[in-house]
């Protein structure tokens, strides 16, 4: 009798774990679907490969992304990871100047090692 109670308790715990895991997965999937359905020309996006671009044309399964002025490439919608929100425009306000970066050669010279 005691082993039956333990088995039922174990099954109940496993069932609860599976329920909450699938619920979280469904919520994540719905957020991704909502993102793909809301893409519009002019949106700034990140791709899964880390590229930042501007959407030019939205098709059924593809998007045309402008990755540099006048350079447009076609990508699958599935390659879009997320939309760049206006709050993410920190770098637009604080553009880097060429002297702001330290290059590897400068690091080696400052350490005294060559």
UniProtKB/Swiss-Prot annotation:
It is a single-pass membrane protein. One of its GO terms (cellular component) is plasma membrane. The chain crosses the membrane at residues 1-21. It holds the Pfam family YajC. It comes from the Bacteria. InterPro entries: Preprotein_translocase_YajC. One of its GO terms (biological process) is protein transport. It is found in: Cell membrane. The SecYEG-SecDF-YajC-YidC holo-translocon (HTL) protein secretase/insertase is a supercomplex required for protein secretion, insertion of proteins into membranes, and assembly of membrane protein complexes. While the SecYEG complex is essential for assembly of a number of proteins and complexes, the SecDF-YajC-YidC subcomplex facilitates these functions. Part of the SecDF-YidC-YajC translocase complex. The SecDF-YidC-YajC translocase forms a supercomplex with SecYEG, called the holo-translocon (HTL). This is Sec translocon accessory complex subunit YajC. The gene is yajC.
């Amino acid at each position: 009798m005691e082993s039956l109670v333990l088995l039922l308790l174990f099954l109940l715990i496993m069932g609860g774990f599976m329920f909450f895991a699938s619920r979280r997965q469904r919520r994540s999937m719905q957020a991704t679907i909502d993102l793909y359905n809301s893409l519009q020309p002019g949106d700034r996006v990140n791709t899964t490969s880390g590229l930042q671009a501007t959407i030019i044309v939205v098709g059924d399964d593809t998007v045309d992304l402008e990755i540099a002025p006048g350079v447009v490439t076609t990508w699958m919608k599935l390659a879009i990871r997320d939309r760049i929100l206006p709050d993410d425009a920190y770098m637009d306000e604080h553009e880097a100047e060429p002297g702001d970066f330290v290059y590897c050669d400068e690091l080696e010279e400052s350490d005294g090692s060559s």
